[in-house]
């Protein structure tokens, strides 16, 4: 038996042990996590045994397939979803440099967001214009967005499809911004596999981003993707990812004398430097993942349809079990004309309720049910954002309540209906006051 086959047999044994449903009351029911079997382990081992760790053929295929899953043509694999947002806005800023000015630099963004959907806006010199979100869908408040889009100082919009619930007005926002010479970036980190108007999330935007962190719909361990419809945009993004380098060759052929393009020493830049492998056109970063992550991601993509089905089935089942407590809480729902790909099950305690989030989450955690808040909730409530807290003209009352009263539990494929029913039973017991 060859060493490679022997290793794969051991990996297969471990992989089968890895994928088990939690036992309610005995094992932790996570809010999310990776769903693996032996195929992911084998894909990773193949890359390790091949000996090429840098980005190569697996990464290029992963970029292409992920881009198509987000309604785009070209992808750039990066080391996280947060990096994807940064690279997306860096690329857009370069492309829209003639339209951005001191009097037109505001970017619309929901106040209830993940921090790194907001942070690149601030870090790259734009001014965030915060809008509120709706209870239930957690989408940006439509009237506020429309009012903001009519302002002369707005250049763009950046938002996440909240917790796997596509924003149905995305196409409308994109068309308004496009007509006005502005841009839209869709953060699809929580919504891979979701659709609006029967097309994938990511379709109606100038750039779409994704996270492949372990908690998300597919995983590569860590990782992210930024996707575009034009090759030029992909090359700009790759340059920002790869230290600002002008060369876009990739794969094992970069080790050849003339590079993967065969023109390494062709002097195509007029600066008296003949080796274009080391020409830097931008102030870039090192945001590269590795080939092994792409190999895992490709296997996960093949399972996406099943993952989405499991998430949505778990979500629907939990919702049916909790319908009796709608007087106390806002339960989540999707808008008409969208197909969700639920990341989690968010619950917001109503303002008039005597319940508290602390009571619910501490009680659930004591029963081995993992909970999370709605990420940052209203980001403006956090210390890092205090200096920009006065930058919005709109009421953020819903985001304020989400900051204090919203939590979420899991619906991911790693839990089954038995776990879902255990979650529901415990929530109902707490709400009824019978938490024994």
Enumerate the language-model features and the residues they cover.
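Active-site phosphate-binding strand-loop segment of PLP-dependent enzymes
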Residues: 136-220, 225-235, 408, 412
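N-terminal "arm"/small-domain region of PLP-dependent enzymes with the aminotransferase-like
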Residues: 1-53, 182, 281, 410
């Amino acid at each position: 038996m060859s060493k490679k086959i022997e290793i794969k047999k051991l990996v297969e044994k471990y992989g089968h042990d890895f994928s088990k449903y939690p036992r309610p009351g005995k094992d932790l029911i996570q809010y999310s996590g990776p769903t693996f079997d032996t195929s992911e382990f084998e894909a990773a081992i193949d890359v390790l045994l091949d000996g090429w760790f840098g980005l190569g053929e697996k990464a290029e295929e992963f970029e292409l397939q992920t881009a198509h899953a987000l309604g785009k043509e070209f992808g750039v694999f990066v080391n996280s979803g947060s990096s994807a947002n940064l690279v997306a806005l860096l690329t857009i800023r370069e492309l829209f440099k003639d339209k951005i000015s001191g009097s037109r630099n505001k970017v619309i963004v929901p106040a209830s967001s993940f921090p790194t959907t907001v942070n690149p806006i601030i870090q790259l010199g734009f001014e965030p214009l915060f809008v509120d979100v709706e209870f239930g869908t957690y989408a940006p408040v439509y009237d506020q967005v429309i009012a903001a889009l009519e302002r002369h100082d707005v250049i763009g919009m950046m938002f996440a499809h909240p917790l796997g619930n596509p924003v149905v007005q995305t196409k409308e926002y994109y068309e308004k911004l496009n007509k006005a010479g502005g841009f839209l970036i869709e953060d699809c980190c929580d919504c891979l596999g979701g659709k609006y108007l029967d097309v994938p999330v990511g379709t109606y935007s100038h750039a779409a981003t994704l996270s492949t962190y372990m908690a998300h719909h597919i995983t590569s361990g860590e990782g992210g993707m930024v996707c575009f419809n034009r090759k030029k945009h992909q090359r700009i993004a790759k340059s920002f990812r790869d230290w600002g380098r002008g060369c876009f060759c990739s794969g094992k052929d970069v080790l050849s004398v003339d590079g993967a393009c065969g023109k390494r020493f062709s002097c195509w830049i007029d600066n008296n430097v003949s080796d274009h492998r080391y020409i830097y056109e931008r102030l870039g970063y090192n945001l590269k993942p590795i080939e092994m992550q792409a190999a895992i991601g490709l296997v996960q993509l093949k399972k996406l349809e099943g993952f989405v089905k499991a998430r949505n089935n778990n979500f629907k089942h939990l919702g049916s079990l909790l319908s009796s407590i709608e007087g106390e809480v806002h339960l989540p729902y999707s808008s008409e004309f969208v197909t969700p790909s639920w990341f989690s099950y968010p619950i917001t305690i109503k303002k008039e309720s005597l319940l508290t989030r602390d009571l619910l989450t501490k009680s659930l955690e004591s029963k081995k049910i993992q909970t999370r808040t709605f990420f940052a909730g209203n980001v403006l409530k956090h210390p890092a954002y205090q200096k920009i807290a006065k930058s919005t003209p709109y009421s953020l009352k819903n985001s304020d309540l989400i900051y204090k009263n919203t939590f979420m539990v899991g619906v991911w494929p790693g839990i089954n209906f038995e776990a879902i029913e255990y979650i529901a039973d415990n929530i109902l017991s707490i709400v009824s006051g019978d938490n024994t």
